[in-house]
Amino acid sequence: TVIDVKCTSPKQCLPPCAKQ
């Protein structure tokens, strides 16, 4: 699972952001 680099904050790069 690659982390979405589009997330501005690392805390936002969580499951909720992964759904985006």
UniProtKB/Swiss-Prot annotation:
Transmembrane regions listed in the UniProt entry: none
Intrachain disulfide bonds: none
GO CC term (a single one): extracellular region
Tissue expression pattern: Expressed by the venom gland.
GO molecular function: potassium channel regulator activity; toxin activity
Chain coiled-coil ranges: none
Major location category of this protein: secreted
Subcellular location: Secreted
Gene3D superfamilies: Knottin, scorpion toxin-like
Keywords annotated in UniProt: Ion channel impairing toxin, Neurotoxin, Potassium channel impairing toxin, Secreted, Toxin, Voltage-gated potassium channel impairing toxin
Domain of life: Eukaryota
Domain notes: Has the structural arrangement of an alpha-helix connected to antiparallel beta-sheets by disulfide bonds (CS-alpha/beta).
Family affiliation: Belongs to the short scorpion toxin superfamily. Potassium channel inhibitor family. Alpha-KTx 02 subfamily.
Role played: Potent selective inhibitor of Kv1/KCNA voltage-gated potassium channels.
Record protein name field: Hongotoxin-5
Taxonomy of the source species: Eukaryota, Metazoa, Ecdysozoa, Arthropoda, Chelicerata
